[in-house]
């Protein structure tokens, strides 16, 4: 059984990819991986896991503002993840969470950001569904 209705998946996947990319692009001197870990373990992301329409329908900029206010979040100094990788990681995590119906806080522990950074070269050209299945339920 999937985490929520299939009708939501493409929007959630796209918005999370855009969110991760937005953070990496606008803050090249901040730690994108630390943001991703915080976001995936947040109440904001839990609301998306639970298909709460208010959060599920937000755009990436709206989601960023909501997350920062709700979680009292500030970015940490560090290095941004570059290129298309943040977008892909966001999409991968959103689809993985939906596909295996796991809490996002568990997904980021089972499939760490560092693993996805290393596996990016071999996975990012695959269809997202196939990439998620290749990684498998850890």
Could you describe each region identified by the protein language model?
Residues 1-101, 110, 114, 119-138:
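C-terminal alpha-helical interaction appendages
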